[in-house]
UniProtKB/Swiss-Prot annotation:
It comes from Saccharomyces cerevisiae (strain ATCC 204508 / S288c). It comes from the Eukaryota. Belongs to the trichothecene 3-O-acetyltransferase family. The gene is AYT1. Its EC number is 2.3.1.-. One of its GO terms (cellular component) is peroxisome. This is Trichothecene 3-O-acetyltransferase. The keyword Transferase applies. One of its GO terms (molecular function) is trichothecene 3-O-acetyltransferase activity. It is an enzyme of class 2 (transferase). Disulfide bonds: none annotated. Keywords: Acyltransferase, Transferase. Trichothecene 3-O-acetyltransferase involved in self-protection against trichothecenes, mycotoxins acting as eukaryotic protein synthesis inhibitors. Its existence is surprising in a non-trichothecene producer organism which needs no self-protection again endogenic trichothecenes. The persistence of this non-essential gene may be due to a selective advantage that it may confer, like a resistance to exogenic trichothecenes. GO terms for biological process: mycotoxin catabolic process.
Length: 474
């Protein structure tokens, strides 16, 4: 097994802000530039007179956050790009972290808190164009949101609706993953409570991100562990695939697995787990159940022998010896493969065990793979040649990112509103086969956002095995 040697950093009496304006090496991927992770915390506001207090508290909190972590108030820019060279992304300073305040109480197109709560906070009622300061994806020519003109590292939008507040926080993905964003949100929560930051928080929060992943020396050569990350210059696509891809109509929707459903899925999975499997997580089991169910739905339009890939995002902080609160981008992917027919026939326990096995360092060393990927990126002038991951075939595969362990239901930002009633990702453009597990509340349920073809949704919603465990929210 590959081991990473971690060199401890000495504490300094004062933190020098923006001494290093570099990103994690993984953040140098052009595909992550102006790609934003959005998360909404939704609170009930009984009294509109609290609006001024809410805005003032957020304003002071963001000012304190920017003063102590100046890079959060910056913008990401690209420099030195030309033909065959994607250049370098770095952070340039700005004067403050953006806060947008929007009053939608008189907007008839905006939902009310009562309507949101009655519908169980569906994704179709939470569109990014209304509720987010930056769109998820911002291609050249985009005219919507702040990222149309700049590339803020971090931004907040407070949306007042009738009876509630939709507080949307976004982080640029080439700077931070969802775990890093959670760390920043917790720091903002602390600053809103006017509590001082500890020396450790200041140290970790201002760490030199460009040195977070150790690189191999010049004797190292790329090997087969990077088969999923090296982008093919061309790919033969059949006429059938092109036709289906062009004609696809995909829709985002939330489904809920209640605490009882999760318990029953675990009982079912544990009956058939492979021998030698010491542990499978709830995430493993739900991922397996979704992959199995979606594959079964796709048998109505694809051949049984069609290969399906599962790409799963994995936080690698622990594997690289970095703090759990490290606020940067440290995520890699694991991959599993099977035919649609085999996935449908395979038992839940066997499939969950198979997915779990890819987290075993004896089977797949994520620490080595991450360092190898970072080394390859550092050597490559044109970083479009390397990607985490090379795109999965969305006709048959799925990509899963779990935010289930992101603890946001206890964050109140000192707004006087108590805990959020719901935490959701707003709706953005349809990206077929992309799946997000939402943060879990104290009630124990798991809400999952899936983007699937309408035909696949029809098959799923008519599948008794699926509906026995998953409740459609929309």
């Amino acid at each position: 097994m590959f081991r990473v040697k971690i060199i401890s950093q000495k504490r300094t009496k004062s933190v020098q802000m923006l001494e290093n304006d570099q990103l994690d090496i993984l953040g140098q991927q052009p595909s992550l530039y102006k790609l934003y992770t959005q998360i909404c915390s939704i609170y009930r506001v009984p009294d509109p007179s609290a609006h001024d207090h809410i805005v003032n508290t957020l304003t002071r909190g963001l000012e304190t956050l920017a003063k102590n972590f100046q890079w959060l108030a910056g913008n990401v820019v690209n420099e030195g790009a030309d033909e065959g060279n994607t250049g370098t992304y770095r952070i340039v300073p700005s004067d403050k972290i953006p806060l947008i305040v929007q009053d939608l109480r008189e907007d008839l197109s905006a939902p009310t808190m009562d309507s949101l709560e009655k519908a169980d906070f569906p994704i179709y009622m939470l569109d990014e164009k209304t509720f987010a300061p930056c769109m998820t994806i911002n291609p050249p020519g985009n005219t919507i949101g702040m990222a149309a003109k700049s590339g803020p590292v971090f931004a907040v939008q407070a949306n007042f609706i009738s009876g509630g507040l939709v507080l949307t926080i976004v982080g640029q993905h080439n700077i931070m993953d969802i775990t890093g964003q959670e760390s920043i949100i917790n720091l903002l929560n602390k600053s809103c409570h006017q509590k001082p930051f500890s020396d450790e928080e200041l140290l970790i929060g201002n760490i030199d991100k460009s040195k977070s992943i150790p690189l191999f020396d010049e004797t190292w050569e790329p090997d087969t562990t990077l088969v999923h990350e090296i982008v093919e210059t061309s790919r033969n696509t059949s006429g059938e695939e092109k036709e289906q891809s062009c004609s696809s109509n995909s829709t985002w929707a939330y489904v809920e697995f209640s605490a009882i459903s999760l318990q029953n899925l675990r009982i079912l999975a544990m009956q058939t787990c492979t021998s030698g499997t010491k542990f499978v997580s709830t995430d493993d089991i739900v991922t397996a159940f979704i992959w199995k169910s979606v594959s079964r739905a796709r048998l109505s339009r694809l051949k049984p022998e069609t290969k399906s890939n599962l790409g799963r995002a994995v936080d690698v902080r622990k594997r690289l010896g970095l703090p759990e609160t490290y606020p940067g981008l440290l995520v890699n992917m694991t991959f599993n493969t099977g035919s649609l027919k085999s996935l449908d026939h395979k038992s839940l326990g066997v499939l969950a065990s198979q997915i779990r096995r890819k987290l075993d360092p004896k089977v797949f060393d994520l620490a080595y793979n991450t360092c190898a990927l970072a080394t390859l990126l550092s050597r490559c002038p044109d970083k479009t040649k390397v990607s985490i991951p090379q795109p999965i075939d969305t006709l048959s595969g799925i990509m899963v990112s779990s935010w289930a362990k992101v603890s946001l239901y206890d964050v109140d930002f000192n707004l006087g509103l108590g805990k959020p009633k719901s935490v959701r990702r707003p709706r953005f453009i349809s990206l077929e086969s992309l799946i997000y597990f939402m943060p879990r509340s104290s009630r124990g349920e798991m809400v999952v956002a899936l983007c699937l073809r309408d035909k696949d949704w029809e098959c799923l919603n008519a599948d008794k095995e699926w509906t026995n465990y998953a409740t459609h929210i929309g």
